[in-house]
Amino acid sequence: MTALPRYAVFGNPVAHSKSPQIHQQFALQEGVDIEYERICADIGGFAQAVSTFFETGGCGANVTVPFKQEAFHLADEHSERALAAGAVNTLIPLKNGKLRGDNTDGIGLTNDITQVKNIAIEGKTILLLGAGGAVRGVIPVLKEHRPARIVIANRTRAKAEELAQLFGIEAVPMADVNGGFDIIINGTSGGLNGQIPDIPPDIFQNCALAYDMVYGCAAKPFLDFARQSGAKKTADGLGMLVGQAAASYALWRGFTPDIRPVIEYMKAL
């Protein structure tokens, strides 16, 4: 009996990850059987865990917090997106035994916004809240969609300035943000605990979409605040999660899943 193709997500913690359910839905669409597991790597033991996984027949891996930067350094080759992001969330084994690193977070976000939420990014003004790895990972792909303007706001201005210079966008201190944004995306680490960034409510008055990169209960405080402050549409990061997973799956298997039914399936769980 042939062993099933094996995939995994590496993180710490990782028990909460929804990646196994998502990838099993993709496999159903493709009409194949796969194995997809969660691997909690020790801090300091990530490289060894990845090496063991691929040496024992692993066919592809996702990488989540806190290992995305380490995965970048572990990869032998990088996609342009991964190079721009300085982080890797997808590892692809090559025939020569090397590992290629890619970053599908940006595609996950933009596909959810443009294809599922049906909101164009081209020509729009975008405000990014936060300047950590999650935000850095999506800027290169947002720029490919040719928005009129991207502004990054962060509690510590220096970090926002650093990203602004790197990507040729604008930076403002969180307290100085004022209105006129079509799309507002929350990527602050406070979002994970349901903390709302320190921003004035009037910035949401002409906002077509307020988006939180986290999903579920953690996104609720920010999205409620955005809705009450005038945002026309709000969305949590579930679609981004499914979208980045679909892009990873396509890199491993050459099959591009339809994310819409999988987003609906995950919402119903």
UniProtKB/Swiss-Prot annotation:
Pfam family, any one: Shikimate_DH
Enzyme Commission number(s) of this protein: 1.1.1.25
Any GO BP annotation: chorismate biosynthetic process
Family annotation (CDD domains): NAD_bind_Shikimate_DH (cd01065)
Domain of life: Bacteria
Gene Ontology cellular component list: cytosol
Binding partners and assembly: Homodimer.
Name of the featured protein: Shikimate dehydrogenase (NADP(+))
